Regions:
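Short Pro/Gly-enriched coil loops immediately N-terminal to beta-strands
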Residues: 6, 104, 177-179
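A short, polar/proline- and glycine-enriched secondary-structure boundary/capping micro-motif
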Residues: 33-37, 93-98, 206-207
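Structured beta->alpha junctions
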Residues: 3-5, 88, 100, 190
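Internal nucleotide-binding/catalytic subdomain
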Residues: 1-79
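Peripheral (often C-terminal) accessory segments that flank ATP-dependent C-N-forming ligase machineries
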Residues: 110-215
Length: 215
């Protein structure tokens, strides 16, 4: 449905204990140009998600969401947020580990605790800054380059690069998330600006498909 609605995409991550539903935060998601629908980046607690958070949360409550962890997606239209997807699970694609690193509580242990009957007592909003950047291949070819996966700590800023293709691999562009060459995740629990860390990672990234020459 997302590809037929006009407007930015946001997520809302919630925790519920059966009595209360808490919005812990969400991602503002950047997408590729139409007609394809590929996520290219995501910012934790971006301006669109913050501006429409209460309206999004109200829609989930009206739908009956109230227990456990839930990952929902909305399109922000000129008439407000439109609910397009509810998943009764944690957000995935590596962002669950990002939230565990960013939160002041254990993301996974809290989810398990809810199913053991524990209540949500205290502050479960996740603050700080986080950015996820997907390096997307622009064409088919043989993967070439030397970039590898790593985790780097620079004071409060943690950069994690996960390489998703290997050198020598024959790659066929599919205009989907199968075109990802790597995922770069950067977090700062204290909320520091992440722009320089992202630029450093991208400037050192060396992996791309080379065009095959027909014989």
């Amino acid at each position: 449905m997302e590809q037929f609605l006009q407007g930015p995409l946001v997520t809302l991550e919630t925790l519920g204990d059966g009595n209360q539903l808490i919005a812990v935060g969400g991602f503002d998601v950047s997408l590729s140009e139409p007609p394809y629908f590929i996520e290219t980046a995501a910012d934790w607690n971006g301006p669109n998600g913050i501006a429409h958070r209460e309206a999004c949360l109200a829609q989930l409550k009206a739908f009956g969401v109230g227990f456990g962890v839930c990952h929902s997606e909305f399109i922000i239209t000129e008439n407000g947020p439109v609910l397009v997807e509810i998943n009764y699970r944690s957000i995935g694609d590596g962002r669950e580990f990002l939230l565990n690193n960013l939160a002041h509580f254990g993301w996974f242990s809290t989810i398990l605790g809810l199913h053991l009957g524990r209540r949500l007592d205290g502050d479960y909003q996740i603050h700080g800054s986080a950015h996820v950047h997907y390096v997307v291949a622009g064409h088919s070819g043989v993967i070439d380059g030397g970039s590898t996966s790593f985790i780097q700590h620079d004071d409060d800023i943690i950069t994690q690069q996960q390489v998703l293709k290997t050198a020598g691999e024959h790659f066929q562009q599919s205009y989907s998330n199968k075109d990802y060459l790597a995922r770069i995740s950067i977090v700062s629990p204290s909320g520091r600006n992440l722009d320089q860390a992202l630029q450093n990672a991208l400037s050192n990234f060396d992996l791309a498909p080379t065009r095959e020459v027909a014989a």
